[in-house]
């Protein structure tokens, strides 16, 4: 079964559809953007981000759409693209400072933080502050052994680095 974000009647929600085709099933119905759906390695949960609480935050739900649970609660950051590790113990995410973007925006060319937390939402830590944003960790890039993950950062002259470099 595939999970994806789709726009229907001006609302963005998470849907699933059988891989062989068929009828799609709407899993979320909260107002605003629900995006970034990703199954955990055993297909029990779908991780996603949602603006339903006022800021973009990480959420988790059962694969059938039940038990939708907010996993991050940061009042100063918009949290995007939660990626669960293959061993289902850790989650990485990219965070935009409140005020740098609107809650539903995930734009490039911003200073962001990459964070990691335990899969139960505890022990949130900033791993690195970098210049990036859209494209930094849009897809799950954990190593199969759950010990490393890849991300993208870049520099633009005049933004984040001096013009003369």
Protein language model features and the residues they cover:
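Sequence signature of WD/YWTD-type beta-propeller architectures
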Residues: 1-165
């Amino acid at each position: 079964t595939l999970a994806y974000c789709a726009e229907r009647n001006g609302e963005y929600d998470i849907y699933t559809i059988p891989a062989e085709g068929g009828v799609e099933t709407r899993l979320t119905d909260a107002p605003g953007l629900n995006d970034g759906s990703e199954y955990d390695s055993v297909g029990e949960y779908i991780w996603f981000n949602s603006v339903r609480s006022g800021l973009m935050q990480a959420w988790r739900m059962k694969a059938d759409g039940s038990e939708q649970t907010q996993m991050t609660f940061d009042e100063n950051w918009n949290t995007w693209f939660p990626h669960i590790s293959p061993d289902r113990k850790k989650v990485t995410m990219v965070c935009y400072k409140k005020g740098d973007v609107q809650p539903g925006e995930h734009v490039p060319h911003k200073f962001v933080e990459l964070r990691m937390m335990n899969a139960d939402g505890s022990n949130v830590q900033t791993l690195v502050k970098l210049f990036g944003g859209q494209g930094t960790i849009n897809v799950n890039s954990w190593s199969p052994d759950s010990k490393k993950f890849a991300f993208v950062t870049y520099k633009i002259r005049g933004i984040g680095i001096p013009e003369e470099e």
